[in-house]
Amino acid sequence: MGRSSRREFLRQVGHAGLALGLGSKLGALTGCDSVNSASGRYDVIIVGGGTAGVIVAAKLLAASGGRKRILIIEAGGKTAASIGGTDLPPWLPPGAAGLALFDVPGQYSTVPFTPLGAPYQLTETPFTYQGIGLGGNSQFNGMLFQTNPPLVFNRSWPEGWGWTDMAPYFKRIRQNMPVTNTPSADGIPQNTGPADIVHPLYESMGWVETDTSRPFPEQGVFSRPYVAAEDGMRAGPVSGYFEEVDPGGVPVEGLEILEFTKADLIEFDDNGRAAAVHYTKRGALDQKLPGEPGSAKLKKDGLLVMAAGGLVTPRLLLLSGVGPKGREGEIFPGQTPVPFAIENQHVGVGLFDHVLTMVTFGYDGPVPYQAYNYADYEGNEADLQEYLATRSGPYAQYQPVSILNLRRGSDVPNVEVFVNPNGAGTPGGPFYGPDTLSAFIMLLNPKSRGLVTLDENGNVRFPSIYMPPDTPEGQEDIELMTQATFDILQLFKEDPGLGIVFGPGSQSFPDLDPDNIEDVRTYVTSPSPVDGVFYSRLTVNHWGGTARLTDGPGGVDPETLILRGTGNVAVVDASLIPTVVPAHPVGTIMAVADRAGDILAAKWD
C-alpha cells in the first residue's frame, strides 16, 4: 500500500474505530474520541503533543499494547488531515477532501505571522511564532533535515549519547519519514532559480554539492534542501509515528487527548513526585476563549513527560516551583517570587537558538528566474490545480530552495546560508519585486546563552541571546556574523546580475558600504525593523538547552531522562539537548524523542 493511500486508509479506519499496528503491537485496538476532561488516574501524562510528544506517545502506546492509560495535554488541536485536521487551505475547492492546511509544503510560509496562522500562535511566547496543535512546530516549519555532527555527540553529550548510540535512531527516523531534495511528487525540482544562480558561485570557492542531510567532512557543502516529504505532502512525526495511533483523529485504546488545553501547574507531593497536572481547557482553538479548569492525576507509579518545547517546558517547571534556587529574581524580574521548592540549577538556564541576518537581492542575469509568492492564489491558480491533481509543482516545495553549510575556523559547521525565492516585506513593495531573492546568513554554533524569564502574566520574555554586545560570547557571535555576511556579499558580487535591494548600499541603507566590513558590522547589529522589514538578530525557533542532559548535579539524568530533584518527571524535547545543534535541529529532536520512547518504555519491561 502506498503512503498516500495508506494515509487515506488511516482516515477511514479511524472513524471505524480501528488502528493499524505500530510494530504490530497496536492492531485491532478500538478507539475513542478526544476527551473533554481528565478522569481517573493515568500511567503517563504527556504535556505537549508537539514534535517530541507525539513520537513518545506513539512509542509508549506500542510498548504497552494499549494496556496503559496515556494522556496528552495539547494547547492546540488536530492538524494534518490524516489525524482529523479540518483547517483547509483557502484555495481548496468546495467538496475537496483529504488535504489540510498543514499538509501542503508550500503553504507553510504563508502561516507564521499572518492572519491565516494567527490562531495557532502560542500566546505564552508572544515575541515569536510557536505553533500549537498535534505535531507542534513540525507542522508549521520547513522540515529541513540535517544531522547533528557526530563530533558534537561524542564531545558535548553525556556518556551513552554518543554518535554510535544515536546513529540507529537517525536511521529509524528516515525509515519512518522520507527525506528528499525533490519533494514534488513528479520528482522535478521546483523554484530552482536561486540555486541555479548561486550554486556556481559556491562551486567557484571549491565547495562541494552533496547530500546536506547527512554528516559531511568538507569545509563547505551545498545543495537543494533535503526535507521531510512524501508524494508531494509534508512528512514528519505525525505521518511517521502518530497517525497510526490517532487515525482520522480517533485515538486508539489507551490514548486520550485533551485538545485546546494548556497545562497551568504541576502538583508535587512532599517527595518531589508529580501527582497531578492542573490545566485550563478551552472549547475551541481560539486562545482568547475562557476555559474550564481541571486536573489530570497520575497513578502512584505514574510518569509525567515534559514535551512542550525548549521554551514552554521550562516555563511550566519554573511556574510549578522547580528551578535554580537563588535565581528567582532573575527569572521573575520585577516581581516577588517565592523560592523554588525543588532545586535544579539547569531548569531555564542555558537557553540557545540560532540567529539570522537577511540581505535581499535583485537579479537581472541570464538564468531564468521569477520570485514566487505562495500567498498569490489567484496568480498561482495553474500551480494550485497542478498540485491538487498530481501533488506536484511549486506548492510541493518548501522554502528555502538553496542551502550552504560552512566550517569557518571550526571543526563543526558554524555558518549556513539559505536562499528563499522571494523578496522582503510586502509583495510588490520596494524590496519584493518579480526578480528578488533573499539570502539568510545563520550562525549554526552561536556562543551566546541565556535564561528563560517570565513576565507578571507568566509569559516567556524575549531572551537576550541574539548577538548581545555586552558579553564576550555576544561579541564573538557578532564577529563571525560580520565576517560571514561580508564574505557572502563579496561572493555574490562576482555575479554581475545580482544587486543588493535590501541591505548595505541599497535604498534601505544608502550610507553603508557593502565593501566596508565595519559598515557590514553596523548592518548586522542595527535594530530591526527598517522600512517594515526585519533583517537583523532574527530568531530562528531552534531553542533548546533549558533542562539539559548532564552528569549532575541538576539537569536531566541521561540514563533515565528523569529531571533531577523530581521522582517521576521526564524530559524528552529540545530542552534536554545539552548544547546547540550546529544544524537544523528537527532531525535531532526526533531522534532524541524516538530514543526517549525506548528509555521510558523500558520501565515497563
Predicted regions and their residues:
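N-terminal export signals
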Residues: 2, 8-30
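Beta1/beta-strand and adjacent pyrophosphate-binding region of the FAD-binding site
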Residues: 39-50
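Glycine-rich loop(s) and the adjacent beta-strand/alpha-helix scaffold that form part
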Residues: 55, 59-70, 76-88, 266, ...
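Redox-cofactor-proximal catalytic regions of oxidoreductases
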Residues: 85, 90-207, 368, 439-466, ...
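Conserved redox-cofactor binding core of oxidoreductases
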Residues: 139, 152-269, 274, 508-509, ...
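FAD cofactor-binding and catalytic pocket of flavoenzymes
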Residues: 159, 358-484, 536-545, 571-574, ...
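A glycine-rich dinucleotide-binding beta-alpha-beta segment and adjacent secondary-structure elements
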Residues: 264-265, 498-580
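A conserved FAD-binding loop/helix module that cradles the flavin
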Residues: 581-595
